[in-house]
């Protein structure tokens, strides 16, 4: 199902739609307007550590905090799990990638985001993958960043289909 809402502002009619595709493991967000508008697409919060914005593509990386002291089963014996001292080895890593398509106007990437100027429509497609392997392996085995990027590439390939096919 697609969630949509329409409203008007300054004599312009806006429609915003959001759809999450389970087969493609991604999100599609669309904004359409009866009049040109400008918007800055950027990502904040959510434990993001690095952001990279290009003209129509963005990549995010981060680590969700983990908890030491949880009981896990290792070699069929319960034991307490403690994260290593190195911050980059603590928690669940994630990588997100997305693309931005504009109708009309122009797009400019900067360190702050992707600025879309004088557009009548915007579509953002985004997928995120994590190092989480499941509760039974959550703290003893995680996907490597290379494995995450491989799964993410497959998701983005599926997500590149026309909207109606998702």
Across the structure, where does each feature detected by a protein language model lie?
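Aromatic-residue-lined binding/catalytic grooves and analogous aromatic/hydrophobic interfacial grooves
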Residues: 1-166
């Amino acid at each position: 199902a697609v969630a949509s809402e329409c409203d008007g502002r300054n004599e312009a009619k806006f429609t915003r739609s959001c759809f999450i595709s389970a087969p493609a493991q991604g999100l599609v967000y669309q904004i359409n307007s009866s009049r040109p508008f400008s918007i800055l697409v950027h990502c904040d919060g959510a434990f993001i550590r690095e952001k990279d914005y290009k003209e129509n593509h963005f990549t995010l990386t981060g680590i969700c905090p983990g908890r030491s002291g949880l009981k896990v089963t290792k070699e069929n014996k319960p034991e307490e799990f403690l994260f290593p001292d190195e911050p980059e080895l603590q928690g669940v890593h994630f990588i997100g990638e997305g693309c931005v398509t504009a109708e009309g106007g122009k797009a400019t990437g900067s360190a702050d985001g992707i600025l879309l100027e004088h557009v009548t429509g915007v579509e953002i497609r985004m997928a995120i993958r994590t190092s989480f392997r499941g509760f039974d392996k959550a703290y003893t085995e995680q996907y490597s960043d290379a494995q995450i990027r491989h799964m993410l590439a497959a998701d983005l390939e599926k997500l590149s289909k026309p909207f109606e096919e998702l």
